[in-house]
């Protein structure tokens, strides 16, 4: 009986957060270990289904860089990075789209639908809802997003699962590979999402003593970047989070995707588990 009481108490504790997010859109960048480990995949699917069933509208933007590198290596196609950004060539853009849209996207959609959700897989070429220009080679910089298209899918009670491939400027253009963190940030702003969550392989933003910083503002982030506390691979994630907040998303969250049910723990508990980023 005590266990049943504790279960009910947990549900009641989450009620204020469910009420706050009911009918609101949450964009989730899905990547890292959470996208590879079978146990974490299952946890992720259950979290998304939970949000969906209580009236919250999840949108998933996924990466797939490791898998793309594996396929390129197997095909003896050289992989080059410039300032931490993959240089996508005319040859590798076709492989990137094959992996992101044809393999990973379909796997996520199937996983969610097997759990009872109504997910649909798309990329930026569908309705040309996400367009880009060249940043370096066929790695792109987003120029426009049709938020109406994504919101239409949400209004039909669908969960959009978005592969970060953007349309080019002509019918024959092969498209652009987009950084998934950037895509999640830009999509969140374009569809007026309430929150954007980045799943990572770190607890969040850490101070110099390797302790989690639970909350950061724009001003605090700039100071931490200047003194080297925020460095390396965390810089683009923080920049993407901050970009979303600057464009109207209420808060961004950088959380540890290696923890089971990390999304629910961040959104539906008072303490959260990661770093929340707000403008001020």
UniProtKB/Swiss-Prot annotation:
This entry carries the following GO cellular component terms, namely:
cytoplasm
Q: Site feature Transition state stabilizer: at which residues?
A: 29, 237
Respond yes or no to whether keyword Transferase is given for this record.
yes
Q: Which domain of life is it from?
A: Bacteria
In alphabetical order, the GO MF annotations are: acetylglutamate kinase activity; ATP binding
**Which reaction is the catalytic activity of this chain?**
N-acetyl-L-glutamate + ATP = N-acetyl-L-glutamyl 5-phosphate + ADP
Compartments, as annotated in UniProt: Cytoplasm
Instruction: Summarize where substrate binds, as residue positions.
Output: 64-65, 86, 177
Q: Respond yes or no to whether keyword Manganese is given for this record.
A: no
Q: Its pathway?
A: Amino-acid biosynthesis; L-arginine biosynthesis; N(2)-acetyl-L-ornithine from L-glutamate: step 2/4
**Signal peptide residues on this chain, from the entry's feature table:** none
The EC number(s) this enzyme carries: 2.7.2.8
- Provide the alphabetized UniProt keywords: Amino-acid biosynthesis, Arginine biosynthesis, ATP-binding, Cytoplasm, Kinase, Nucleotide-binding, Transferase
Q: Which GO BP annotation is one of this protein's?
A: arginine biosynthetic process via ornithine
Return the Pfam families for the record: AA_kinase (PF00696)
Which InterPro entries did the record assign? AceGlu_kinase-like_sf, AcgluKinase_fam, ArgB, Asp/Glu/Uridylate_kinase, Glu/AcGlu_kinase, NAGK-C
Q: Which HAMAP family match?
A: ArgB (MF_00082)
**Function statement:** Catalyzes the ATP-dependent phosphorylation of N-acetyl-L-glutamate.
Q: Which family does it belong to?
A: Belongs to the acetylglutamate kinase family. ArgB subfamily.
Please give the name of this protein.
Acetylglutamate kinase
Q: What's the source species for this entry?
A: Nautilia profundicola (strain ATCC BAA-1463 / DSM 18972 / AmH)
- The record's gene field reads argB
């Amino acid at each position: 009986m005590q266990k049943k009481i504790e279960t009910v108490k947990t549900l009641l504790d989450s009620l204020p957060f469910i009420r706050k997010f009911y009918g609101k859109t949450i964009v989730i960048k899905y990547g890292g270990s959470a996208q590879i480990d079978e146990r974490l995949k299952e946890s992720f699917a259950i979290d998304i289904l939970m949000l969906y069933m209580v009236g919250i509208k999840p949108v998933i933007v996924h990466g797939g860089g490791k898998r793309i590198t594996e396929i390129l290596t197997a095909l003896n196609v050289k992989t080059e990075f410039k300032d931490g950004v993959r240089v996508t060539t005319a040859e590798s853009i076709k492989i990137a789209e094959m992996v992101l849209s044809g393999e990973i996207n379909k796997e996520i959609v199937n996983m969610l639908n097997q759990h009872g959700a109504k997910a649909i897989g798309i990329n930026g070429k569908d309705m040309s809802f996400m367009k880009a220009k060249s940043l370096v080679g066929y790695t792109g910089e987003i120029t426009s997003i049709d938020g109406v298209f994504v919101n239409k899918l949400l209004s039909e009670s669908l969960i959009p699962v978005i592969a970060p491939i953007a349309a080019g400027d002509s019918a024959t253009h092969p498209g652009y590979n987009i950084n998934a963190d950037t895509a999640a940030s830009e999509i969140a702003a374009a569809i007026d999402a309430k929150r954007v969550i980045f799943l990572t392989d770190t607890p969040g933003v850490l101070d110099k003593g390797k302790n989690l910083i639970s909350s950061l503002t724009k001003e605090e982030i700039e100071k931490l970047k200047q003194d080297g506390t925020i460095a390396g691979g965390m810089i683009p994630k923080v920049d993407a989070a901050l970009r979303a907040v600057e464009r109207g998303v209420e808060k961004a969250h950088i959380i540890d995707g290696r923890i089971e049910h990390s999304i629910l723990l961040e959104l539906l508990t008072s303490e959260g588990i990661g770093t929340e980023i707000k403008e001020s």
